[in-house]
Amino acid sequence: MPAISHITAPAPSRPFAGPFANDAFAIAANKETTVTIDLPTISWPDGLGPTPKPFADHAPGSVISGPLSEQCDVLVLLYTTFEIQALLDVFTNNPAWTAARQKSWYGYAHNFDKFKSIIQGIDDDTALKDGLFGYVFPLMVGETRVVLYKTELHPKTNGTGLPFIPVIQQLVSELQPKLVISTGTAGGIGSHIQCGDVVITDAARLHCKLNYPKYPAIDTLSKNNTQLTNTVTVNDKYVAYAAQNFTKLSLPGLAKCYAEFATRQGYSFLKKNSSAPSIYVKGVNPVPGPQPMDIVSADYLTVDDNNNSEGLQSLGTMNDTDDAFAFYAINQLSGTKPNWLSIRNASEPQVDVPKFPPGTSPTQVVDKLKTLAGAIYGVYQYCTTLNSAFACWGVIAGM
């Protein structure tokens, strides 16, 4: 049985840096203590356990200031501290994301000076202050070459110049992956997604409030709710294996998360996980309900509720702030492009609230939803992400 524990995230890689530090969602999340568990050693099938595979041309712990000269089959994009800790727990049986662990990875700094002028919020992030876009780490899953990339740039926090986009394009051009996976926490859209469930999809939509002068197509895509698509055939053999054998390992942690809310007023809609969370795959076993199997990526923090107050329910099944931006970046590359997938876990479900009284302002409505959802995210973000990490392994193992 996994042991329940609590860990404290290090200062870097805050998910709510810059203008989002005072958002109602962030304030609620930051008041909570994130529940974590210590996973048992995982028995991987068919010799498919992840194993480190250092770059041949770079010493572990070195800073890569020029182009990466080695290629991979899969590039996995990671965003927040708790998200990478959960994936590391699954992939390496060691969730630590300490300064020492970061120094054992490879700092990615190619062309930092070129892009520095368009990066806002450098002083809010230790890695950016050190001239690093993020950290990369190579490993193998069977015969599949994988590179993990923990980005310190985020679409929602580093300004309307969107430095995240050219850096992703540069990294993809150097590594030449066949598949890019963007993964981590998300909010559930619709009533069928519960905490810990995972959605794997090759479709995304942008949902933006800001204008991006350098990327006017983003404004148009968002305004028209245009679907970004590619065609990825997921061999679900090991995804199904993960759903059958691995997602149940998150249940002790999810039970502890639920206990944090069992007696809180206003959270009766939150359901206790009575069975292993589901992994839904677009085109294989879609999420029940009318919502399209899309990831909806906003440049602000969004929440679905039973009144569809933010109009998300016609757009997708999960909402985040990253994936569609990454996929837009990939789609704009010339020549051969990699396929891409969003693999997201629900860290908070649809919020269920009574009808708001007449005269309630839109801001009051959204802040109420964010306060409820942000608290759930704050508690559940680690334990739910274990399941998207299992799903990532399943997709990679099936290649």
Residues of each region from the PLM?
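Intrinsic-disorder/coil detector with helix-boundary
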Residues: P2-K370, V379-M399
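Short glycine/proline- and acidic residue-enriched helix-loop micro-motifs
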Residues: G374
